[in-house]
């Protein structure tokens, strides 16, 4: 009960918990019965084996049974408006992951020119952090090659001018997870049909892609609720991005959130990340 597991993961988490617990008990029993440490009596041997097996089983539980702790990522724009050194000095290694936002003029005509070299800077500052990228473009195919070099997940929008399956396949061919973006301002009839072949889904909760500091789109709550009621909900991770703060994240059921202005404009960005993590997992 010290681990906060979303309701739709109860069955899977319980299965992992029982499997790991039974396996660890079986291993412990046979090791204790047939193995004795030299110069140690039976009771001490059992105590040592029990401790070792417990630590191994506990780590497996963390990795599998209770792996669904909600995560907070910070958004970094792939342009020249932000300085990576400044961002790092504010948040250091406190974010759970790094979310890279990229938008071109097909989705926002007022956007500045991209700076793809920032990927190298990001990777240098956070070498062990997971990088998830969000391509906001109606023609994402031309960007997949460069994004695949640095990303573990590449999100793209459903409202594009290219074939969705082709984009998805190109991302997968680069051994990267494709993620589908749904915009909260749109209404989707068959959500399950749209997301059923994805392990990662992102809901964009602001009106204009690529602009930080916008208000949370209230209709987003309805879309999030519809997605969380899907019968296949445990098959994908849900990420919520845009306009998030302490006031609304407590009402959001998801695995990950993305924050930019709420963290960076705070007087203590590191503490704010911790606050968001606590609220999400409370």
List the predicted regions and their residue ranges.
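N-terminal active-site wall of soluble small-molecule enzyme domains
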Residues: 99-170
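Interaction-mediating elements
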Residues: 1-68
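Glycine-rich phosphate-binding active-site loops on the catalytic face of alpha/beta enzymes
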Residues: 158-162, 202-213, 254-273
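Glycine/Thr-rich beta-alpha phosphate-binding loop at enzyme active sites
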Residues: 105-113, 192-232, 271-272, 278
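Catalytic cores of alpha/beta
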Residues: 84-91, 139-149, 185-197, 242-257
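Hydrophobic faces of well-ordered beta-strands that scaffold small-molecule active sites
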Residues: 70-76, 98-100, 131-135, 152-156, ...
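Conserved, mostly hydrophobic/aromatic
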Residues: 91, 101, 147, 201, ...
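Alpha-helix-loop-beta-strand connector modules within alpha/beta enzyme cores
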Residues: 112-133, 170, 174-179, 183, ...
């Amino acid at each position: 009960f010290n681990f906060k597991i979303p309701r739709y993961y109860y069955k899977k988490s319980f299965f992992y918990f029982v499997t790991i617990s039974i396996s660890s008990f079986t291993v412990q029993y046979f090791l204790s019965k047939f193995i004795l440490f030299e110069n140690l009596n039976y009771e001490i041997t059992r105590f040592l084996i029990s401790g070792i097996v417990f630590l191994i089983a506990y780590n497996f539980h963390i990795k599998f049974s209770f792996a669904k702790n909600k995560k907070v990522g910070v958004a970094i724009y792939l342009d020249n408006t932000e300085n990576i050194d400044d961002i790092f000095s504010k948040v250091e290694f406190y974010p759970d992951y790094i979310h890279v936002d990229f938008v071109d003029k097909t989705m926002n005509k007022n956007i500045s020119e991209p700076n793809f070299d920032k990927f190298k800077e990001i990777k240098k500052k956070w070498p062990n952090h997971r990088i998830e990228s969000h391509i906001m473009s109606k023609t994402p195919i031309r960007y997949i090659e460069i994004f695949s070099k640095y990303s573990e997940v590449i999100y793209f929008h459903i409202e594009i001018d290219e074939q969705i399956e082709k984009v998805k396949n190109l991302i997968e061919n680069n051994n990267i997870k494709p993620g589908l973006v749904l915009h909260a301002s749109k209404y989707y009839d068959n959500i399950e049909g749209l997301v059923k072949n994805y392990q990662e889904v992102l809901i964009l909760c602001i009106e204009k892609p690529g602009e930080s500091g916008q208000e949370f789109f209230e209709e987003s709550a309805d879309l999030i609720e519809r997605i969380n009621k899907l019968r296949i909900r445990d098959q994908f991770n849900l990420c919520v991005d845009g306009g998030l703060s302490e006031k609304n994240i407590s009402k959001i059921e998801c695995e990950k959130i993305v924050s930019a202005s709420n963290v960076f404009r705070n007087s203590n960005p590191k503490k704010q990340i911790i606050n968001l993590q606590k609220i999400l997992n409370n």
